[in-house]
Swiss-Prot record:
Residues 2-148 form the Globin domain. O2 binds at H65. This is Myoglobin. Nitrite binds at H65. The lineage of its organism: Eukaryota, Metazoa, Chordata, Craniata, Vertebrata. The gene is MB.
Length: 154
């Protein structure tokens, strides 16, 4: 299920574009997640009160959290699958503290793909989309394995 060197290159090429505005991309990803899957908003006490897209766009806290999410994901992607050290604390906090189901990680993966498609169509063609999907699936599978070790049925 690993990615080829060429696939990792496609992932990291588009990720370079994301890093030019992590907070903006992250905010868009979270807004897309909350719009497509409103139930996910319930896991975020800090954002539950944000009812409209305009409120979400105006939230500095949402922007900061988007930056945090994509900074962590970027660190994981740059490890090209050798991300056990990065995954462990993330799985621990998402399983024991936040109680985030794996399904929600699938939802945010979809949101990431959609935001990249809309913001970077020239750098995110079918090959890059396929590579990013594989990279995000690898991440989710490894988080799910850690969840299982922790006894979390997410």
């Amino acid at each position: 299920m690993g990615l080829s060197d060429g696939e990792w290159q496609l992932v990291l090429n588009v990720w370079g574009k994301v890093e030019g505005d992590l907070a903006g991309h992250g905010q868009e990803v979270l807004i897309k997640l909350f719009k497509n899957h409103p139930e996910t908003l319930e896991k975020f006490d800090k954002f539950k009160h944000l009812k409209s897209e305009d409120e979400m766009k105006g939230s500095e806290d949402l922007k900061k959290h988007g930056n945090t999410v994509l900074t962590a994901l970027g660190g994981i992607l740059k490890k090209k699958g050798q991300h056990a050290a990065e995954i462990q604390p993330l799985a621990q906090s998402h399983a024991t503290k936040h109680k985030i189901p794996i399904k929600y990680l699938e939802f945010i993966s979809e949101a990431i793909i959609q935001v990249l498609q809309s913001k970077h169509p020239g750098d995110f063609g079918a090959d890059a989309q396929g590579a990013m999907s594989k990279a995000l699936e690898l991440f989710r599978n490894d988080i799910a394995a850690k969840y299982k070790e922790l006894g979390f049925q997410g």
